[in-house]
Protein backbone atom coordinates (compact mmCIF):
# COMPACT_ATOMS: atom_id res chain seq x y z
CA UNK A 1 0.00 0.00 0.00
CA UNK A 2 1.66 3.22 -1.21
CA UNK A 3 1.75 6.28 1.00
CA UNK A 4 2.51 8.64 -1.88
CA UNK A 5 0.62 11.92 -1.63
CA UNK A 6 -1.75 12.65 -4.48
CA UNK A 7 -1.15 15.52 -6.89
CA UNK A 8 -4.20 17.38 -5.58
CA UNK A 9 -2.95 17.19 -1.99
CA UNK A 10 0.47 18.56 -2.98
CA UNK A 11 -1.04 21.34 -5.11
CA UNK A 12 -3.50 22.47 -2.43
CA UNK A 13 -0.74 22.35 0.17
CA UNK A 14 1.37 24.67 -2.00
CA UNK A 15 -1.65 26.97 -2.28
CA UNK A 16 -2.00 27.13 1.51
CA UNK A 17 1.77 27.59 1.92
CA UNK A 18 1.79 30.65 -0.35
CA UNK A 19 -1.44 32.02 1.12
CA UNK A 20 -0.14 31.78 4.66
CA UNK A 21 3.09 33.54 3.70
CA UNK A 22 0.88 36.33 2.34
CA UNK A 23 -1.46 36.43 5.35
CA UNK A 24 1.22 36.19 8.03
CA UNK A 25 3.14 39.08 6.47
CA UNK A 26 0.05 41.18 7.20
CA UNK A 27 -1.21 39.83 10.55
CA UNK A 28 1.68 41.06 12.77
CA UNK A 29 1.39 44.64 11.46
CA UNK A 30 -2.41 44.76 11.01
CA UNK A 31 -3.20 46.11 14.52
CA UNK A 32 -0.60 48.87 14.08
CA UNK A 33 -1.92 49.67 10.59
CA UNK A 34 -5.49 49.95 11.87
CA UNK A 35 -4.31 52.16 14.74
CA UNK A 36 -2.52 54.41 12.24
CA UNK A 37 -5.88 54.84 10.46
CA UNK A 38 -7.51 56.00 13.70
CA UNK A 39 -8.91 52.67 14.88
CA UNK A 40 -8.74 52.19 18.66
CA UNK A 41 -8.57 48.90 20.58
CA UNK A 42 -12.34 48.37 20.30
CA UNK A 43 -12.17 48.73 16.52
CA UNK A 44 -9.34 46.20 16.34
CA UNK A 45 -11.47 43.77 18.37
CA UNK A 46 -14.48 44.48 16.15
CA UNK A 47 -12.50 43.70 13.01
CA UNK A 48 -11.22 40.43 14.45
CA UNK A 49 -14.60 39.27 15.75
CA UNK A 50 -16.61 40.37 12.72
CA UNK A 51 -14.24 38.81 10.21
CA UNK A 52 -14.22 35.47 12.05
CA UNK A 53 -18.03 35.45 12.26
CA UNK A 54 -18.47 36.17 8.56
CA UNK A 55 -15.98 33.44 7.64
CA UNK A 56 -17.57 30.84 9.93
CA UNK A 57 -21.14 31.38 8.73
CA UNK A 58 -20.17 31.12 5.06
CA UNK A 59 -18.36 27.80 5.41
CA UNK A 60 -21.46 25.63 5.71
CA UNK A 61 -23.14 27.50 2.84
CA UNK A 62 -20.13 27.14 0.54
CA UNK A 63 -19.75 23.48 1.48
CA UNK A 64 -23.42 22.81 0.72
CA UNK A 65 -23.32 24.53 -2.66
CA UNK A 66 -20.17 22.65 -3.66
CA UNK A 67 -22.17 19.45 -3.02
CA UNK A 68 -25.23 20.79 -4.81
CA UNK A 69 -23.47 21.69 -8.07
CA UNK A 70 -20.99 18.81 -7.86
CA UNK A 71 -18.01 21.18 -8.20
CA UNK A 72 -15.60 22.34 -5.49
CA UNK A 73 -12.72 23.89 -7.44
CA UNK A 74 -14.59 27.13 -8.40
CA UNK A 75 -15.20 27.89 -4.71
CA UNK A 76 -11.55 27.25 -3.90
CA UNK A 77 -10.29 29.43 -6.76
CA UNK A 78 -12.71 32.29 -6.14
CA UNK A 79 -12.15 32.15 -2.38
CA UNK A 80 -8.37 32.44 -2.64
CA UNK A 81 -8.69 35.06 -5.38
CA UNK A 82 -11.08 37.20 -3.34
CA UNK A 83 -8.77 37.08 -0.33
CA UNK A 84 -5.76 38.20 -2.39
CA UNK A 85 -7.74 40.97 -4.11
CA UNK A 86 -8.98 42.21 -0.72
CA UNK A 87 -5.40 42.42 0.57
CA UNK A 88 -4.42 44.56 -2.42
CA UNK A 89 -7.35 46.91 -1.75
CA UNK A 90 -6.51 46.99 1.98
CA UNK A 91 -3.17 48.59 1.15
CA UNK A 92 -5.06 51.61 -0.24
CA UNK A 93 -7.21 52.11 2.90
CA UNK A 94 -7.31 55.66 4.21
CA UNK A 95 -9.68 55.14 7.18
CA UNK A 96 -10.33 52.30 9.61
CA UNK A 97 -13.81 51.97 8.05
CA UNK A 98 -12.15 50.76 4.85
CA UNK A 99 -10.13 48.26 6.87
CA UNK A 100 -13.29 46.85 8.52
CA UNK A 101 -14.88 46.18 5.14
CA UNK A 102 -11.77 44.81 3.42
CA UNK A 103 -10.57 42.55 6.24
CA UNK A 104 -14.12 41.14 6.43
CA UNK A 105 -14.10 40.67 2.64
CA UNK A 106 -10.81 38.79 2.92
CA UNK A 107 -12.45 36.47 5.45
CA UNK A 108 -15.38 35.98 3.06
CA UNK A 109 -12.82 34.44 0.71
CA UNK A 110 -11.68 32.10 3.48
CA UNK A 111 -15.27 31.14 4.23
CA UNK A 112 -15.88 30.27 0.59
CA UNK A 113 -12.80 28.08 0.12
CA UNK A 114 -12.16 26.12 3.33
CA UNK A 115 -14.89 23.44 3.26
CA UNK A 116 -14.68 22.74 -0.51
CA UNK A 117 -10.86 22.60 -0.29
CA UNK A 118 -10.95 20.14 2.63
CA UNK A 119 -13.50 18.05 0.72
CA UNK A 120 -11.08 17.83 -2.25
CA UNK A 121 -8.28 16.84 0.13
CA UNK A 122 -10.47 14.11 1.64
CA UNK A 123 -11.63 12.80 -1.75
CA UNK A 124 -8.05 12.75 -3.06
CA UNK A 125 -6.70 10.68 -0.17
CA UNK A 126 -9.12 7.92 0.73
CA UNK A 127 -6.45 5.53 2.07
CA UNK A 128 -4.07 7.99 3.77
CA UNK A 129 -6.35 10.85 4.76
CA UNK A 130 -4.55 11.62 8.01
CA UNK A 131 -1.21 11.89 6.21
CA UNK A 132 -2.76 14.18 3.59
CA UNK A 133 -4.34 16.55 6.10
CA UNK A 134 -1.18 16.48 8.20
CA UNK A 135 0.98 17.42 5.20
CA UNK A 136 -1.43 20.22 4.31
CA UNK A 137 -1.33 21.67 7.84
CA UNK A 138 2.47 21.36 7.92
CA UNK A 139 2.77 23.35 4.69
CA UNK A 140 0.22 25.88 5.95
CA UNK A 141 2.16 26.44 9.17
CA UNK A 142 5.51 26.56 7.36
CA UNK A 143 4.10 29.41 5.30
CA UNK A 144 3.03 31.13 8.52
CA UNK A 145 6.57 30.90 9.91
CA UNK A 146 8.11 32.37 6.74
CA UNK A 147 5.44 35.08 6.52
CA UNK A 148 5.99 36.22 10.10
CA UNK A 149 9.75 36.37 9.56
CA UNK A 150 9.32 38.34 6.32
CA UNK A 151 7.01 40.81 8.05
CA UNK A 152 9.65 41.43 10.70
CA UNK A 153 12.38 41.95 8.08
CA UNK A 154 10.29 44.18 5.80
CA UNK A 155 9.10 46.42 8.63
CA UNK A 156 11.97 46.57 11.12
CA UNK A 157 15.01 46.10 8.87
CA UNK A 158 13.96 47.52 5.50
CA UNK A 159 11.66 50.16 6.99
CA UNK A 160 8.89 49.72 4.42
CA UNK A 161 5.52 51.36 5.03
CA UNK A 162 2.45 49.40 6.15
CA UNK A 163 0.83 50.03 2.77
CA UNK A 164 3.81 48.74 0.78
CA UNK A 165 4.09 45.58 2.88
CA UNK A 166 0.36 44.80 2.61
CA UNK A 167 0.40 45.40 -1.16
CA UNK A 168 3.38 43.06 -1.57
CA UNK A 169 1.61 40.42 0.53
CA UNK A 170 -1.43 40.65 -1.72
CA UNK A 171 0.72 40.06 -4.81
CA UNK A 172 2.23 36.95 -3.19
CA UNK A 173 -1.32 35.76 -2.50
CA UNK A 174 -2.19 35.87 -6.21
CA UNK A 175 0.58 33.37 -6.96
CA UNK A 176 -1.40 30.84 -4.90
CA UNK A 177 -4.04 30.75 -7.65
CA UNK A 178 -1.68 29.06 -10.13
CA UNK A 179 -1.61 25.65 -8.37
CA UNK A 180 -5.41 25.78 -7.96
CA UNK A 181 -5.76 25.80 -11.75
CA UNK A 182 -3.89 22.48 -11.91
CA UNK A 183 -6.17 20.70 -9.41
CA UNK A 184 -8.34 17.99 -10.98
CA UNK A 185 -11.59 17.05 -9.27
CA UNK A 186 -13.24 13.67 -9.32
CA UNK A 187 -16.50 13.54 -11.25
CA UNK A 188 -19.41 13.87 -8.84
CA UNK A 189 -23.14 13.91 -9.30
CA UNK A 190 -24.80 17.12 -8.12
CA UNK A 191 -26.86 16.70 -4.94
CA UNK A 192 -30.33 18.08 -5.64
CA UNK A 193 -31.51 18.64 -2.09
CA UNK A 194 -32.05 21.66 0.10
CA UNK A 195 -29.52 22.76 2.71
CA UNK A 196 -31.96 21.65 5.40
CA UNK A 197 -32.22 18.13 3.96
CA UNK A 198 -28.45 17.92 3.49
CA UNK A 199 -27.92 18.88 7.13
CA UNK A 200 -30.50 16.30 8.24
CA UNK A 201 -28.62 13.65 6.24
CA UNK A 202 -25.48 14.13 8.34
CA UNK A 203 -24.97 10.96 10.43
CA UNK A 204 -25.43 10.87 14.19
CA UNK A 205 -21.79 9.96 14.86
CA UNK A 206 -20.70 13.04 12.96
CA UNK A 207 -23.14 15.30 14.82
CA UNK A 208 -21.92 14.01 18.19
CA UNK A 209 -18.29 14.54 17.19
CA UNK A 210 -19.03 18.13 16.15
CA UNK A 211 -20.60 18.74 19.58
CA UNK A 212 -17.51 17.38 21.36
CA UNK A 213 -15.14 19.31 19.08
CA UNK A 214 -17.11 22.51 19.73
CA UNK A 215 -16.86 21.92 23.50
CA UNK A 216 -13.10 21.67 23.08
CA UNK A 217 -13.17 24.81 20.91
CA UNK A 218 -14.87 26.70 23.76
CA UNK A 219 -11.72 26.13 25.80
CA UNK A 220 -9.29 26.53 22.90
CA UNK A 221 -8.89 30.30 23.24
CA UNK A 222 -6.61 32.43 21.08
CA UNK A 223 -2.84 31.88 21.14
CA UNK A 224 -2.44 35.53 22.19
CA UNK A 225 -3.16 34.63 25.83
CA UNK A 226 -0.23 32.20 25.84
CA UNK A 227 1.99 34.98 24.50
CA UNK A 228 0.61 37.48 27.03
CA UNK A 229 1.36 35.10 29.91
CA UNK A 230 5.00 34.86 28.81
CA UNK A 231 5.16 38.62 28.36
CA UNK A 232 3.78 39.24 31.85
CA UNK A 233 6.44 37.00 33.38
CA UNK A 234 9.29 38.61 31.45
CA UNK A 235 8.11 42.12 32.28
CA UNK A 236 9.19 41.17 35.80
CA UNK A 237 12.20 38.95 35.04
CA UNK A 238 13.70 40.81 32.08
CA UNK A 239 11.72 43.87 30.88
CA UNK A 240 14.07 44.47 27.93
CA UNK A 241 13.12 41.07 26.47
CA UNK A 242 9.40 41.21 27.31
CA UNK A 243 8.43 41.55 23.64
CA UNK A 244 11.20 39.68 21.84
CA UNK A 245 11.07 36.44 23.87
CA UNK A 246 7.28 35.90 23.58
CA UNK A 247 7.47 36.46 19.81
CA UNK A 248 10.32 33.97 19.51
CA UNK A 249 8.33 31.50 21.61
CA UNK A 250 5.42 31.90 19.16
CA UNK A 251 7.76 31.10 16.26
CA UNK A 252 9.00 28.08 18.26
CA UNK A 253 5.39 26.92 18.69
CA UNK A 254 4.81 27.15 14.92
CA UNK A 255 8.03 25.27 14.15
CA UNK A 256 7.00 22.39 16.44
CA UNK A 257 3.46 22.42 15.04
CA UNK A 258 4.75 22.23 11.46
CA UNK A 259 7.33 19.54 12.27
CA UNK A 260 4.83 17.19 13.93
CA UNK A 261 1.78 17.70 11.67
CA UNK A 262 2.65 15.23 8.91
CA UNK A 263 4.09 12.46 11.14
CA UNK A 264 1.00 12.71 13.33
CA UNK A 265 -1.25 12.47 10.28
CA UNK A 266 0.57 9.35 9.11
CA UNK A 267 0.33 7.86 12.60
CA UNK A 268 -3.42 8.52 12.69
CA UNK A 269 -3.79 6.45 9.50
CA UNK A 270 -2.00 3.56 11.21
CA UNK A 271 -3.33 3.51 14.77
CA UNK A 272 -6.62 5.36 14.34
CA UNK A 273 -7.63 8.98 14.77
CA UNK A 274 -9.52 8.43 18.01
CA UNK A 275 -6.32 7.68 19.94
CA UNK A 276 -4.61 10.73 18.45
CA UNK A 277 -7.49 13.04 19.39
CA UNK A 278 -7.67 11.71 22.95
CA UNK A 279 -3.93 12.36 23.28
CA UNK A 280 -4.32 15.82 21.75
CA UNK A 281 -7.18 16.99 23.95
CA UNK A 282 -5.42 15.62 27.02
CA UNK A 283 -2.09 17.26 26.12
CA UNK A 284 -3.82 20.61 25.60
CA UNK A 285 -5.30 20.35 29.10
CA UNK A 286 -1.88 19.47 30.52
CA UNK A 287 -0.26 22.40 28.68
CA UNK A 288 -2.82 24.87 30.03
CA UNK A 289 -2.24 23.54 33.54
CA UNK A 290 1.50 24.02 33.03
CA UNK A 291 1.00 27.68 32.11
CA UNK A 292 -0.61 28.27 35.51
CA UNK A 293 2.70 27.44 37.20
CA UNK A 294 5.23 28.62 34.58
CA UNK A 295 7.67 31.33 35.67
CA UNK A 296 10.92 30.75 33.75
CA UNK A 297 12.25 30.71 30.19
CA UNK A 298 12.97 26.96 30.39
CA UNK A 299 9.37 26.27 31.41
CA UNK A 300 7.99 28.37 28.55
CA UNK A 301 10.25 26.66 26.00
CA UNK A 302 8.86 23.29 27.06
CA UNK A 303 5.25 24.48 27.29
CA UNK A 304 5.19 26.24 23.91
CA UNK A 305 6.63 23.04 22.42
CA UNK A 306 3.85 21.01 24.07
CA UNK A 307 1.33 23.54 22.77
CA UNK A 308 2.68 22.96 19.25
CA UNK A 309 2.51 19.17 19.63
CA UNK A 310 -1.06 19.40 20.97
CA UNK A 311 -2.12 21.48 17.98
CA UNK A 312 -0.49 19.01 15.58
CA UNK A 313 -2.40 16.18 17.26
CA UNK A 314 -5.73 18.00 17.09
CA UNK A 315 -6.02 20.30 14.08
CA UNK A 316 -5.49 18.05 11.06
CA UNK A 317 -6.80 14.96 12.87
CA UNK A 318 -10.16 16.60 13.60
CA UNK A 319 -10.57 17.46 9.91
CA UNK A 320 -9.60 13.96 8.78
CA UNK A 321 -11.83 12.30 11.39
CA UNK A 322 -14.79 14.48 10.41
CA UNK A 323 -14.20 13.52 6.76
CA UNK A 324 -14.17 9.83 7.71
CA UNK A 325 -17.67 10.12 9.16
CA UNK A 326 -19.35 11.68 6.10
CA UNK A 327 -20.28 10.16 2.75
CA UNK A 328 -18.80 11.79 -0.34
CA UNK A 329 -22.07 13.23 -1.67
CA UNK A 330 -22.56 15.47 1.41
CA UNK A 331 -18.91 15.90 2.42
CA UNK A 332 -18.84 19.59 1.52
CA UNK A 333 -21.92 20.26 3.66
CA UNK A 334 -20.52 18.21 6.53
CA UNK A 335 -17.09 19.83 6.55
CA UNK A 336 -18.71 23.24 6.17
CA UNK A 337 -20.88 22.49 9.21
CA UNK A 338 -17.82 21.36 11.16
CA UNK A 339 -15.87 24.52 10.30
CA UNK A 340 -18.84 26.78 11.01
CA UNK A 341 -19.61 25.34 14.44
CA UNK A 342 -15.94 25.30 15.50
CA UNK A 343 -15.45 28.83 14.22
CA UNK A 344 -18.50 30.16 16.05
CA UNK A 345 -17.43 28.42 19.27
CA UNK A 346 -14.02 30.10 19.06
CA UNK A 347 -15.58 33.55 19.51
CA UNK A 348 -17.07 33.02 22.99
CA UNK A 349 -13.97 30.99 23.91
CA UNK A 350 -11.73 34.03 23.68
CA UNK A 351 -14.35 36.31 25.25
CA UNK A 352 -14.62 33.99 28.27
CA UNK A 353 -10.84 33.67 28.47
CA UNK A 354 -10.43 37.44 28.22
CA UNK A 355 -13.02 38.10 30.91
CA UNK A 356 -11.35 35.63 33.26
CA UNK A 357 -7.96 37.22 32.53
CA UNK A 358 -9.21 40.73 33.25
CA UNK A 359 -11.57 40.18 36.18
CA UNK A 360 -10.15 37.09 37.95
CA UNK A 361 -6.54 36.81 36.83
CA UNK A 362 -4.38 35.23 34.08
CA UNK A 363 -4.16 31.88 35.86
CA UNK A 364 -7.96 31.57 35.77
CA UNK A 365 -7.84 31.65 31.98
CA UNK A 366 -5.55 28.62 31.86
CA UNK A 367 -7.49 26.76 34.55
CA UNK A 368 -10.56 27.23 32.35
CA UNK A 369 -8.67 25.94 29.28
CA UNK A 370 -7.40 22.91 31.22
CA UNK A 371 -10.90 22.16 32.49
CA UNK A 372 -12.46 22.30 29.02
CA UNK A 373 -9.64 20.13 27.66
CA UNK A 374 -10.30 17.50 30.34
CA UNK A 375 -14.04 17.65 29.64
CA UNK A 376 -13.49 17.19 25.89
CA UNK A 377 -11.12 14.28 26.54
CA UNK A 378 -13.63 12.53 28.80
CA UNK A 379 -16.52 13.05 26.39
CA UNK A 380 -14.49 11.80 23.43
CA UNK A 381 -13.43 8.68 25.34
CA UNK A 382 -17.10 7.94 26.11
CA UNK A 383 -18.04 8.68 22.50
CA UNK A 384 -15.35 6.27 21.24
CA UNK A 385 -16.42 3.52 23.63
CA UNK A 386 -20.05 3.89 22.56
CA UNK A 387 -19.13 3.90 18.84
CA UNK A 388 -16.98 0.78 19.23
CA UNK A 389 -19.84 -0.99 20.95
Model-derived features with residue positions:
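Cytoplasmic helix-loop-helix junction between adjacent transmembrane helices
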Residues: 102-142
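Helix-loop boundary and gating motifs at the non-cytosolic
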Residues: 2-52, 208-236, 242
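Residue-level signature of mid-helix packing/kink "hotspots" within the transmembrane helices
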Residues: 52-60, 144-145, 254-262, 343-347
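Helix-loop junctions at membrane interfaces in 12-TM secondary transporters
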Residues: 89-103, 292-303
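C-terminal membrane-cytosol helix-exit motif in multi-pass small-molecule transporters
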Residues: 170-189, 376-384
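Transmembrane alpha-helix termini and helix-breaking/packing motifs in multi-pass membrane transporters
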Residues: 32-36, 146-164, 348-364
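Structural signature of the two symmetry-related core transmembrane helices
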Residues: 74-88, 170, 275-290, 370
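Juxtamembrane intracellular "pre-TM" segments in multi-pass secondary transporters
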Residues: 1-6, 185-212
